Amino acid sequence: MQSTVVPPGGLVLITGVNGFLASHLALQLIQRGYMVKGTVRTAESASWITEAIMRRHPTGKFQAVVIPILSASGVMDDLVKDVDGIAYVAADTSLNPDPDQVITPGLEALKVALQSATQTQSVKRFVLTSSYTAAVDTFVPSAPDALITRDSWNQTSTPRAWAPPPYDALRALDVYQSLKTESETLFWKFASEAKPSFIQNSVLPGFVVGPIIHRKQRGSTAALVKAYFDDVTCNQAFAWISAPWVVDVVDNALLHLAGLIDEDVQNERLLALAEPFKLGNFARVFEQIDPSRSWPAGDNKHGVKDEGGTKWVADTKRSVAILQRLGQDEGFTPFLESVRRTCLDSDPAWTFGNFLPKSDSQE
């Protein structure tokens, strides 16, 4: 690690800390001696995420704060006092196809957080969880081997997301892509125009896999993998997935960590994209994890198709270098190991029934 702008003992605020990525970021910070304050929307979420964090780090400094609506004016003002860094991870993942119910409040909530941060001199870093969909529109044909870089932007999802009703189910994917694109656009416009005293960074992850840390955690995209491993007939949800890349949740968290504390990482878009996504890859990895079971092969069983992958090439040299500085000798975690952790290291009490779309999702 290069020199840090926030040394151990510093306080980091994480929004939506009960979410899959956010909880792993909290664990990485606490493991390194940082204090973490995280927002949740309900007292129940505050209870179980505190249990999950403290079970792993009994002496860690962690506090969950109930904030039902992040878009309320001034709601973050008191929360950011004495905070050294902010990780804005919370996002609506409800798959609601109405852009006014997803994008509008999402942008307002981010704006509220940025404005509150400017009023607190202690804030040194602000990191936004974006998405690969802010860099590339997965529904638009692209030239073979098109290069995706930190300067790539999705310029086509937003018109489709805001087209007039009716809002059918497939519109939800355009709305999500547009939410991430518009959020990051707002984020960097704020940096350019407001010129805050703190440094801003964003992280653009792909399909995130890794261990689900509590039975009540919905698990985001990792839930689809764990459910598929538990029951080979439970793969229908993959039909919704258009992610070209997979990334381990710990690698994703570490890139956020670097954006929060690494002096060398300033005003950057970090691509958290490890390996091409391919549905058939999961069944082949499952065979290695548990060869005693019968797994789907190609198109032959349970509707599993050996499809996916990507026609894009992602320039992740910068992200790999950062991960190596943080002790990840290979850079991104290999696909086999990431899937193994998802399947075997998740809370054994977790079931796919916990993964249900909700309007208050903070994944």
UniProtKB/Swiss-Prot annotation:
Localization of this protein: Membrane
Organism: Aspergillus flavipes
Gene name of the record: tndE
Membrane-crossing residue ranges in chain numbering: 10-30
Listed name of the protein: NAD-dependent epimerase/dehydratase tndE
Enzyme class: oxidoreductase
Domain of life: Eukaryota
Keyword set includes Glycoprotein: no
GO BP terms in the entry: terpenoid biosynthetic process
